[in-house]
């Protein structure tokens, strides 16, 4: 049986988010980004999953980052947010915003590539969940001609999602890419939590 904290975190993440206010206030530092996380059918993971698309607001129909998430609670209460890449993203572009989620019902585990080093670990802290990528420099990203690792953090509440991704040099830990102006602050525009609560479990 799923715990209250697990269901709460998945429900809070399930939504269509925008950092519009932040981008308007500081356009030199923050692009206007849309982030949409849509609940997956239970059978994809035999558990809670989300299909996530991130895109520039001016071109939200063509996301530049697609990831599939599987959230699993551990005995110590830590919630693992396991990351997967789609082997072929083309059949699913734009699927996060389809009213009936028809294409997401065709998703199978065989279409996914696990990214084990990129798992986020979330812990409940009062009215928030705070998470960061699993320690160990395991989430590798080749960018700007260099091998880097992801140093990522996130904070989740009922109505916002804050995240900061920084790429660091494998040897020196120097920041190579990512935000130098603090986290992106996304507010929830559309709530998909009812879809989480309505998931059909076997």
Swiss-Prot record:
Record flagged with keyword Hydrolase: no
GO molecular function, one term: lyase activity
Main enzyme class: lyase
Any one Pfam family match given in the protein's UniProt record, by short name: CpeT
CDD domains linked: CpcT
Disulfide bonds: none
Keywords: Lyase
Gene3D superfamilies membership: CpcT/CpeT domain (2.40.128.590)
Summary of the function given for this chain in its UniProt record: Covalently attaches a chromophore to Cys residue(s) of phycobiliproteins.
HAMAP family on file: Chrphore_lyase_CpxT
Family statement drawn from the similarity comment of this UniProt entry: Belongs to the CpcT/CpeT biliprotein lyase family.
Protein's recorded name: Chromophore lyase CpcT/CpeT 2
Organism: Gloeobacter violaceus (strain ATCC 29082 / PCC 7421)
